[in-house]
From Swiss-Prot:
This is Large ribosomal subunit protein uL18. GO terms for cellular component: cytosolic large ribosomal subunit. InterPro entries: Ribosomal_uL18_bac-type, Ribosomal_uL18_bac/euk. The gene is rplR. Belongs to the universal ribosomal protein uL18 family.
């Protein structure tokens, strides 16, 4: 099993648990260059809010899009957008990535901005 397959297996296991609980998810995906976040409804078919370093407003405010500072900016933006839609309680779906570095920075920024998980 390669690295990506193992990560996807971890992600699937966590997502099934969140689906059983019927929780709104804060889903994070990262690449070496960018980081993406989406708040997905409990039914799994509707994206309530999204933010990423690809967006012009966020990428202009930061120097580089692939570091923890960029993840912090995305975490703050996703929290503000989710709260504007009336979502405060979410489950954090790290998509099988380690809770470390950019993933942890995004989570901390989202918590500081008002999301609860």
């Amino acid at each position: 099993m390669d690295k990506k397959a193992a990560r996807l297996r971890r992600a699937t296991r966590a997502r099934k648990k969140m689906q059983e609980l019927g929780a709104t998810r804060l889903v994070v995906h990262r690449t070496p260059r960018h980081i993406y976040a989406q708040v997905i409804a409990a039914n799994g078919s509707e994206v309530l809010a999204s933010a990423s370093t690809v967006e012009k407003a966020i990428s202009e405010a930061i120097k580089y899009t692939g570091n923890a500072d960029a993840a912090t900016a995305v975490g703050k933006a996703i929290a503000e957008r989710a709260i504007a839609k009336g979502v405060q309680n979410v489950s954090f779906d790290r998509s099988g990535f380690k809770y470390h570095g950019r993933i942890a920075a995004l989570a901390a920024a989202a918590r500081d901005a008002g999301l609860q998980f």
